[in-house]
């Protein structure tokens, strides 16, 4: 059986008296890719942040790449557990090339910069980029830092929300290729068409897990109304 790379059991989190996660449980093994869907405020970002170890107050069992990310030193899984925020913070005067250098893998960065059509933007400060270009630069830096797909856990929060079609397709291909190479990938997305391409769909509603299975089973009429408010295509 493939390695268990993410295990959540009875995970809960509150903020200002509001329950953001309510007893969520799920697991991901090497080679699995799952789409995480839900309406705004359903708890998708909170779940990804908990799995990434950024919510130290979250309760329940959280194991990511064999460690509890709430207590493990950040360096312990720096290149095996990768988290992409939807709106990453950045130094606005930093150039695209300087951001890429943080991956500390020049050849890999050059490859991803080319794939994402960032090469011509290398000397541009992040502040001068469009939202989509900035998101792409952060994704390229993150992807370049992945040394070995097998055994890695990728947690991606709306990675294609601001991207153009060509860059979206690059992300789509990379995500599925990594899963095939043995990574575990959990992707929060509002893109119903992309979510349907995943072998597994996990759905949240008001912090609770309401569906977990293949798209044909998870995409019920109730889920589609709750998340998209209309038939999802």
Regions found by a protein language model. Give the residues of each.
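Helix-to-loop junction immediately C-terminal to a conserved catalytic motif
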Residues: 52
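ABC ATPase NBD coupling module
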Residues: 68-82
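Conserved ABC transporter NBD signature motif
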Residues: 60-68
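Conserved structural motif at the start of ABC-family nucleotide-binding domains
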Residues: 6, 21-23
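The feature captures the beta-strand-to-loop junction immediately N-terminal to the Walker
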Residues: 37-39
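Catalytic Walker B motif of ABC-type/P-loop ATPase nucleotide-binding domains
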Residues: 152-158
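Conserved ABC ATPase "signature" region
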Residues: 107-122
């Amino acid at each position: 059986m493939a390695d268990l790379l993410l295990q959540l059991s009875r995970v809960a989190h509150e903020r200002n008296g509001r329950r953001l996660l309510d007893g969520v449980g799920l697991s991901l093994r090497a080679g699995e890719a799952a789409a995480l869907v839900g309406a705004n405020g359903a708890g998708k970002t909170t779940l990804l942040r908990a799995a990434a170890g950024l919510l130290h107050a979250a309760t329940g069992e959280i194991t990511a790449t064999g460690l509890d990310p709430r207590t493990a030193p950040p360096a312990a899984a720096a290149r095996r557990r990768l988290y992409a925020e939807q709106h990453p913070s950045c130094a606005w005067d930093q150039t695209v090339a300087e951001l890429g250098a943080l991956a500390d893998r020049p050849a890999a960065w050059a490859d991803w910069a080319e794939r994402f059509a960032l090469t011509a933007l290398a000397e541009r400060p992040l502040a001068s980029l469009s939202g989509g270009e900035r998101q792409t630069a952060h994704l390229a830096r993150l992807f370049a830092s992945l040394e070995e797909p097998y055994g890695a856990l990728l947690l991606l929060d709306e990675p294609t929300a601001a991207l153009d079609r060509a860059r979206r397709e690059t992300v789509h291909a990379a995500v599925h290729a990594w899963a095939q190479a043995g990574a575990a990938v959990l992707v929060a997305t509002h893109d119903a068409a992309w979510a349907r391409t995943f072998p597994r769909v996990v759905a949240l509603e008001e912090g609770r897990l309401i569906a977990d299975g293949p798209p044909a089973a998870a995409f019920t009429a109730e889920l589609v109304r709750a998340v998209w408010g209309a038939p999802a295509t």
